[in-house]
Structures are given as C-alpha cells and as structure tokens.
Amino acid sequence: MSGFYHKHFLKLLDFTPAELNSLLQLAAKLKADKKSGKEEAKLTGKNIALIFEKDSTRTRCSFEVAAYDQGARVTYLGPSGSQIGHKESIKDTARVLGRMYDGIQYRGYGQEIVETLAEYAGVPVWNGLTNEFHPTQLLADLLTMQEHLPGKTFNEMTLVYAGDARNNMGNSMLEAAALTGLDLRLVAPKACWPEAALVTECRALAQQNGGDITLTEDVAKGVEGADFIYTDVWVSMGEAKEKWAERIALLRDYQVNSKMMQLTGNPEVKFLHCLPAFHDDQTTLGKKMAEEFGLHGGMEVTDEVFESAASIVFDQAENRMHTIKAVMVATLSK
C-alpha cells in the first residue's frame, strides 16, 4: 500500500475515508490469509520498538504477534524499561530509536508525546493509546462491526456509546464516525461529554459522509434502534478512591444491562467493549467495587450482558491484532 508507506498512525482524522477503508480491507485480507495458512511475511528483517508507559495486555500482544507473523522483531520497553521523560527527552529518545528501529509504537500519556516521537524519529510511529486518542482500538471495532453486519455499510449502522464519553475512546469514536458516516450516539451525562470543538468538527464531517453524531442524556431515546452498544470502564486503579464514588454515582444509570439492550428494540443488537471489563467480582478492582458500592453484577456492564450471545467483545479483541498488523504492513512495506 504505497500511499501509506512511511506514514504515521497517530489519530484517525489524519486519514481520508478512502484510506481508512483500505486499511480495513487490508486487515480483513490479512486475517483471512492467516486463518487459511496463506499469510505472506512482508516485514522480514524489520525491527520494531514497543514503548509502553502504560501496561496493556491486548495492545502488547497484538503488536508482538502481528510483528512475529510478518517476520519482524520487536523490543518491548515497559514502564520501567527506558529513560523516556526521566533521563532523556522524548525528542532525544525519538532520534535514538529512529536510528535503530524501522517503526515505533507508543502507548502512554499525552498526545503531544506521540506527536513529538513522530516529528523526530524519522520512521513510522503508531499510537497504541494516549490520553486523548485510541485509534488502533477503533480500527478493530470497525472491522468487527463490518463482520457482524456484512449487509450494511457504515452509514447504515447505528453505534451507541454509553457511559463516560469524554475520554480517548469517545474522541476516537467521534473521529471514526466522521470518516465512516456512522450514526453515532454518545449516551452520557453532560459532565461526561467530549469537547464541543471536536464534536462540531466531527459532526460536520459525519454528515458529509451520510451519518450523524448525537449527544444525549436520555438513555431510552439514545439507544433506540441501535445496532451496537459500546461501553468502557468507569474507573481505574490509578485513580483516587474518592473519584470512584463520584464517577459511579454519575454513571449508574448508564450501565449496559438487559434493560438497555431491550430498549433498543433490536433483537439482534450486539455488545462491544474494548476490555478489560468489570463485569463481575473476579478481579481485584471488581471485588472492591462489589464490596464498597454493591456492584455485584458488574459495573459498566452486567455479567449477564457480557456473557450473552449478544456480546462480541472477544471478536473485537482478536481483531486488535489483525488491524494493528494492517497498520504495520501498510506503513512499513512498499
């Protein structure tokens, strides 16, 4: 894919609708080739650096397996495995790694960090997650949606995101809707809406591409006719305990449960989640939530919905690897 060669992958709005579609087509082909045993290694001899200032299961495994499948080698630099930002600036780190590696993945904090890496590295840089955007996740989501509704184009699909929409997932969903023409509905309390400027920009683009973007606090109105309902965690272990109570009180009414799924009026509605999910008390945080806030059946999603036939979250998780592979192949091979 010569049009992508040596490009960065930092946020979705850096691309056109046609470019996004070609990445999804490549991901689908790579997935089919892997499953049929016909995959051709395009990245043999390439060296890839994986910078993780925030730990991850899916992102790390996806990049590593995708790289190995394609014949590349990886170096993992974890939260304590480099001098980035401590003894060496991002700018200097970029210039060092760019001399040794063919591509660099960054998962961490501010978007300005991955932008600086891209400016100075001289090799493709990929955003594995920042505070502001999570573009590789949305690629996986879009591929999963295509697979489960093959008879519809994106501008015939309705995607609902319920919960805290002011985070990197909300922002990247706005950008995805802008490029694909999805009917995107962010169903959340006003305190959890994304920045107005990004909403305005993405809504205008979405409408040009045959879709729309709606923000509402009304759950029943927001989920009506949805093809997919998506949510993400409400709290994380790194946050102060006082924040937990505040966030849970704010978002309780936006939990994805069987009632919300029924309110769609669509018996075929599917459930999406970028994972990890607090749907039971089998994790340290899930157990704390159950004990302190009575959330025994799940937090942002009930265990009933998570384990139901409507849940396609593990298809999503698998597709992280196929779509990340597409990004690497597109940007590192001519």
Swiss-Prot record:
**Compartments, as annotated in UniProt:** Cytoplasm
Keywords for this entry?
Answer: Amino-acid biosynthesis, Arginine biosynthesis, Cytoplasm, Transferase
Q: A Gene Ontology biological process annotation?
A: arginine biosynthetic process via ornithine
- Positions bound to carbamoyl phosphate: 56-59, 83, 107, 134-137, 274-275, 320
Q: Please name the InterPro entries in this protein's record.
A: Asp/Orn_carbamoyltranf_P-bd, Asp/Orn_carbamoylTrfase, Asp/Orn_carbamoylTrfase_sf, Asp_carbamoyltransf_Asp/Orn-bd, Orn/put_carbamltrans, OTCase_ArgI
> Where exactly are the transmembrane stretches of this chain?
none
Instruction: Write the protein's name.
Output: Ornithine carbamoyltransferase
What is the species listed in this Swiss-Prot or TrEMBL entry? Escherichia coli O45:K1 (strain S88 / ExPEC)
State the gene name recorded for this protein: argI
